[in-house]
Amino acid sequence: MTQAEIKLCSLLLQEHFGEIVEKIGVHLIRTGSQPLRVIAHDTGTSLDQVKKALCVLIQHNLVTYQVHKRGVVEYEAQCNRVLRMLRYPRYIYTAKTLYSDTGELIVEELLLNGKMTMSAVVKKVADRLTETMEDGKTMDYAEVSNTFVRLVDTHFVQRCPLVPATENSDTGPPPPAPTLVVSEKDMYLVPKLSLIGKGKRRRSSDEDATGEPKAKRPKQTTDNKEPIPDDGIYWQANLDRFHQHFRDQAIVSAVANRMDQTSSEIVRTMLRMSEVTTPSGAPFTQPLSSNEIFRSLPVGYNISKQVLDQYLTLLADDPLEFVGKSGDSGGGMYVINLHKALGSLATATLESVVQERFGSRCARIFRLVLQKKHLEQKQVEDFAMIPAKEAKDMLYKMLSENFISLQEIPKTPDHAPSRTFYLYTVNILSAARMLLHRCYKSVANLIERRQFETKENKRLLEKSQRVEAIIASMQATGAEEAQLQEIEEMITAPERQQLETLKRNVNKLDACEIQVDETIFLLESYIESTMKR
């Protein structure tokens, strides 16, 4: 665990959950697994606050616990899961593009709350969608429920591990902590619920003096009497499935850039056919026959079977080897080599970074060393057609930044420089790790800058929010246009300009965070894929 990762985890925990949770989370990341009282003692936090912080972290899958032989429960932080919080906007946006606003809100609620029952998610999302609709229109629970089922069917949402029924029925003393188990066959099994109803608006005409709707209290009392139909069955967002989707999108985009749109559509079809059957960490997709691929092509994609076979042959013969042929039955069996695809994407990312940092001539040398595997300095000068002095400077720059490495091969046992070959080479895995570390530092800097910008303009932001609240309440009571105009003028022209600048800067920083995270995702996927081999 590097310092850059710990710092980024600290910033993310503080931004999402506050100082106490951040303090406990970072302590566990630094020290490893620890029991409750040791955490309280080492952090100087009260036992009650530590318990609450751990509850929050466990609810969001950021901390796991383990019962040891002597009955001691130890808590361990999941640093990689904390870093995933950086990707929350991307998960939510993906759900929106695939399953519209309903899917977006379902995934958002699950990410914000960590774990929820299906009935609670459906009711909350229906209420939120009803809020945004015109007066008189409401969102039906059944519609939200259908979208939830579709998300489960495509494995974007999955069940949380449960306490087994046998553990609850034991007559002996309860264990210090429950053992959670997950059944593979039930992980994507949706309980049969008859959710009948419509979303409710938060503000309605029958609100009483306290501002609480009358319909709310009876609902709570009935909930106490009637058991919730899916009580105890909790759901969470399946982040690995989202990562699989991001990886597939990156592969399709790479094929489209290298070849053409038809090739990318064929690869997209192959990935879609095997998305649920292929495990997230598998190096290859399941083999698919040419006939199966032809039948599964999108409606309206008018290409003949012969043309499809030609495209598949082209893809299989391509030097990048994204698609491989694994047999001849069924018109030819084809697989997508996910490991090779991730390797190519990581290499392209490294090349792009070298070009941006050091210029096109350095990128030429980098690609040359990458292609030839091992080269002496003289060979680099000759092949790249760059003067000796410039080539030496460029090689040293990249060597000092760890983009390329130097390998010594001695002719004699004494390692004398005059009798040693010095070969330049590119270790993609090592370079990817170095770049990933820099990306973590970049994101931490972006978050700190955004927080600084917001803090510097805190007074102005508070004033703007107060004015907006006054205008909203006056509009609700039917105030005249002149009165509204007078309130709006409370914010002067220079202040308005300052707010616009702040908004523009924060939007830029947010966009940068998401773009850097895309690079982080590619590098992490490649490193993970390489380590599994």
UniProtKB/Swiss-Prot annotation:
Gene3D superfamilies: 6.10.140.1450, Winged helix-like DNA-binding domain superfamily/Winged helix DNA-binding domain. Residues 197-230 are annotated as: Disordered. InterPro entries: POLR3C_WHD, RNA_pol_III_RPC82-rel_HTH, RNA_pol_III_Rpc82_C, RPC3, WH-like_DNA-bd_sf. The modification Phosphoserine is found at residue 194. The keyword Ribonucleoprotein does not apply. The keyword Transcription applies. Pfam families: HTH_9 (PF08221), POLR3C_WHD (PF22536), RNA_pol_Rpc82 (PF05645), RPC3_helical (PF20912). One of its GO terms (molecular function) is single-stranded DNA binding. Signal peptide: none annotated. It comes from the Eukaryota. It is found in: Nucleus. Its main location: nucleus. One of its GO terms (biological process) is innate immune response. One of its GO terms (cellular component) is RNA polymerase III complex. Residues 211-228 have a biased composition (Basic and acidic residues). Keywords: Antiviral defense, DNA-binding, DNA-directed RNA polymerase, Immunity, Innate immunity, Nucleus, Phosphoprotein, Transcription. DNA-dependent RNA polymerase catalyzes the transcription of DNA into RNA using the four ribonucleoside triphosphates as substrates. Specific peripheric component of RNA polymerase III (Pol III) which synthesizes small non-coding RNAs including 5S rRNA, snRNAs, tRNAs and miRNAs from at least 500 distinct genomic loci. Part of POLR3C/RPC3-POLR3F/RPC6-POLR3G/RPC7 heterotrimer, coordinates the dynamics of Pol III stalk and clamp modules during the transition from apo to elongation state. Pol III plays a key role in sensing and limiting infection by intracellular bacteria and DNA viruses. Component of the RNA polymerase III complex consisting of 17 subunits: a ten-subunit horseshoe-shaped catalytic core composed of POLR3A/RPC1, POLR3B/RPC2, POLR1C/RPAC1, POLR1D/RPAC2, POLR3K/RPC10, POLR2E/RPABC1, POLR2F/RPABC2, POLR2H/RPABC3, POLR2K/RPABC4 and POLR2L/RPABC5; a mobile stalk composed of two subunits POLR3H/RPC8 and CRCP/RPC9, protruding from the core and functioning primarily in transcription initiation; and additional subunits homologous to general transcription factors of the RNA polymerase II machinery, POLR3C/RPC3-POLR3F/RPC6-POLR3G/RPC7 heterotrimer required for transcription initiation and POLR3D/RPC4-POLR3E/RPC5 heterodimer involved in both transcription initiation and termination. Belongs to the eukaryotic RPC3/POLR3C RNA polymerase subunit family. This is DNA-directed RNA polymerase III subunit RPC3.
